[in-house]
Amino acid sequence: MKILHIIGTRPQIIKLASVLNHKDSFFEHSIIDTNQHYEDSMQKNLYEDFGIDLSTIKFLDSNKFLSSDIASMFNLLSQELNQIKPDIVFIYGDTNTTVAGALSAKLNNIPSVHIEAGLRSYLQMQIEETNRIIADELCDYLFCPTETAVSNLRKEKLDHKAFLVGDITLDIFLNTKPQKPSLINSDFFDKQYYLSTIHRKENLNNHSKLENILESLSTLSRVVLPIHHSLKNKLIEISLYERIPKNIELIEPLPYSEMLFLIKNSMGVLTDSGGLQKDSFWLEKPTLTIRENTEWRETIESGQNILINEFPVNLIDKFN
């Protein structure tokens, strides 16, 4: 059986790596990367971290479409599907790549699997929420990470194609040893720090909110911020890049194993990332999530993850 995996972002590479760890000789795997995260430092670090040979991946030409352009991605993916002729397509998560992959499979009459199906934040204005709903409607098999996800699909009358398979990123987490970042000086860890990531459009496109988030980060003694290309571009665009509080240390995005090391050795995490919420939860780190709601309800119910969406605020009080 020929399986085609369609991915395009860092979190999707992590999910893909988990699936590829369970390779079977019965399956032939092909990979297409849409280049939705187009920075070499972001993509190649992760592929190399998981031992995935870059020569086995078909990278779409990101010059032919905007990173947010589902229609152009769909057209390019449809061309690739006609050449590869897979028996089934695997799509992952909740990005524009997810929707483009699901749509191209559907309109080319190829069965598809949505991994991480059934997750819901119930924030209808959130792009990722729309992507999840569309993908679950389009795909033939819905692989759910939690019982809550299955329950969500039951409410939408989609449970007839839902399967509770567990969280595949937990497999990767358990099998990845945190590694001390190779490009960071040894004295970096002499002082305590909080870890933060910001990349969601609802936070980046609200300029006053973004400025207030940075102001709130200044209430912490020291913050390490791996800077996503979209955040850097936005900060430059709105003239905030040169005014970042001095207690915030910007670093390049890291491979997954090194990111786990940063989380493990931090005082706490402030993020809008779904994946980082879970990694922090598994590493038992106090977490503040910059959202109105989260699809990972279990982290909230545990009391370890707290939603925070009004800024500025004294984050020391929130972490305590």
Task: Describe these PLM feature segments.
Residues 57-60, 144, 164, 249-252, ...:
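Short acidic-hydrophobic, aromatic-tinged amphipathic segments that line or gate anion-handling sites
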Residues 36-39, 44-47, 179-265:
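Donor-nucleotide binding loops and adjacent catalytic segments primarily
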Residues 4-7, 13-22, 26, 46, ...:
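Active-site and donor-binding regions of nucleotide-sugar-utilizing enzymes
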Residues 24-55:
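N-terminal glycine-rich anion-binding loop in soluble enzyme alpha/beta folds
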Residues 37-41, 60, 138-204, 209:
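A nucleotide-sugar donor-handling region in carbohydrate enzymes
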Residues 2, 87-88, 193, 267-268:
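Structural motif
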Residues 47, 148, 306-320:
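Leloir-type glycosyltransferase catalytic cores
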Residues 91-92, 114-115, 142, 260-299:
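A donor-sugar binding/catalytic signature common to diverse glycosyltransferases
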